């Protein structure tokens, strides 16, 4: 058996004093629980274990894979344009004024204009004028308990609703459709024809016949442009 090493009292005192010095050094400094001990923070002496542990931890952290940072996705949101409330008479000639109720492109049809202030009808058809007047009354009495636009129109024509009911078997013909909008002080009524086999949509759109029996022109759309 190997003989156990023996230490003199002087050697034991040196080891104890070195250990106490290391403890006093760290107790006299603020301790951050999330940080590791660097090699430079370890005082000289019998501290080989602490030094090796600090170096091993530093090497492990350096060798760890670096996670790539996620790029922030920027959504391409179109900018909004706020309309100017200035006098429209001061705008340059032919300045287009956007209105969500009036599409830029329309199918062939007719426009009826009714001035709310004077009651003057610029152009249009009999049906368009009746609808424009009903639209004017609805605009002026929309906060009252009077009859609604639907009641006024349907009382004169039961088939006022676009795509009114067709009795019996389907026959190829046209269906008159209308679109009402308020622009400034005017009521604009736009009308056009669609084949009865076409669907009824919320947009001003011209459909083609799918049943093969609807005519290309009818008595109502002969004057459309």
Curated annotation (Swiss-Prot):
GO terms for molecular function: metal ion binding. Residues 145-172 are annotated as: Disordered. GO terms for cellular component: host cell cytoplasm. Residues 158-169 have a biased composition (Basic and acidic residues). Residues 145-157 have a biased composition (Polar residues). Its main location: host cell. Gene3D superfamilies: 4.10.80.340. Zn(2+) 2 binds at residues 197, 209, 211, 214. Zn(2+) 1 binds at residues 174, 193, 218, 221. It comes from the Viruses. It is found in: Host cytoplasm. Belongs to the paramyxoviruses V protein family. Plays an essential role in the inhibition of host immune response. Prevents the establishment of cellular antiviral state by blocking interferon-alpha/beta (IFN-alpha/beta) production and signaling pathway. Interacts with host IFIH1/MDA5 and DHX58/LGP2 to inhibit the transduction pathway involved in the activation of IFN-beta promoter, thus protecting the virus against cell antiviral state. Efficiently blocks type I and type II IFN signaling following infection, probably by targeting host STAT1 for proteasomal degradation. This is Non-structural protein V. It comes from Simian virus 41.
């Amino acid at each position: 058996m190997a003989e156990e090493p023996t230490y003199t009292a002087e050697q034991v005192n040196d080891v104890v004093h070195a250990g106490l010095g290391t403890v006093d050094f760290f107790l006299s400094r603020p301790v951050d629980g999330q940080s590791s001990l660097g090699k430079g923070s370890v005082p000289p002496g019998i501290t080989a274990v602490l030094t090796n542990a600090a170096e091993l931890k530093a090497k492990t952290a350096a060798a760890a894979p670096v996670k790539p940072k996620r790029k922030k996705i920027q959504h391409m949101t179109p900018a909004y344009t706020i309309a100017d409330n200035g006098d429209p008479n001061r705008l340059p000639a032919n300045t287009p004024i956007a209105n969500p109720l009036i599409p830029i492109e329309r199918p062939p049809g007719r426009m009826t204009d009714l001035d709310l202030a004077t009651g003057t009808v610029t152009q249009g058809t009999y049906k368009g004028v009746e609808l424009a007047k009903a639209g004017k009354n609805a605009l002026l009495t929309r906060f009252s308990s009077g009859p609604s636009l639907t009641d006024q129109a349907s009382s004169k024509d039961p088939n006022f609703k676009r795509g009114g009911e067709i009795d019996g078997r389907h026959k190829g013909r046209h269906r008159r459709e209308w679109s009402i909008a308020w622009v400034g002080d005017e009521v604009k009524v736009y009308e056009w024809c669609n084949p009865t086999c076409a669907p009824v949509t919320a947009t001003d759109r011209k459909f083609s016949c799918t049943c093969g029996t609807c005519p290309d022109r009818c008595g109502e759309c002969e004057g459309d442009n």
